[in-house]
Amino acid sequence: MPFYKIAEMQKNRATANPQQFVQTAVGEFMKAGIVTKPDEEGPPLHMHPNEEQFTLVIEGKLHFVLGDEERICEPGDLIHIPRFTNHRSRAIGGPAVFFTVKSPAGDGDLDQDYNKAEGAEQAEKRFEEAKRKTF
């Protein structure tokens, strides 16, 4: 059973958004990773038809759109993303780091089940509004 030291894990650029860095560990039924997002970065609104996901914010703030809800998530906030739920996050006010777990493990790529969702452009407008309100 492996132990991992995050500081020693290889950083790779994310497939869906190359501005992000991911450090990934893959098990039999789950995949997990530490994701670092630069300020205002993140993939467009998307969903995962085959994966359930949990995300825990570790550092910074994320503007998160989850289904019909949106909020600013901070360290200690845990987000559950069911399959088929449109979502996206952007670091806001500086870079952000989060831990995420997805099931099933698939091929181990955190972006494996990425499917851009309808309404992605509208979600970006919501981010611009959130930036104005926050800062």
Predicted regions and their residues:
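A short glycine-rich, His/Asp/Glu-containing loop-to-beta-strand
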Residues: 10-45
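Short beta-strand His + acidic residue motifs that chelate non-heme Fe in jelly-roll/DSBH
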Residues: 45, 64-65, 81, 87-93, ...
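Short, charged/polar surface micro-motifs in flexible loops or helix N-caps
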Residues: 28-30, 38-42, 61-62, 70, ...
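Hydrophobic/aromatic beta-strand elements that line small-molecule binding cavities or substrate pockets
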Residues: 35, 54, 77, 87
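Short, conserved beta-strand element in jelly-roll/cupin
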Residues: 36-38, 47-64, 101
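A generic "binding-loop/recognition-motif" signal
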Residues: 39, 50, 69, 85-86, ...
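Short acidic-glycine-tyrosine-enriched beta hairpin
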Residues: 68-83
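Double-stranded beta-helix
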Residues: 3-5, 9, 29-31, 88-135
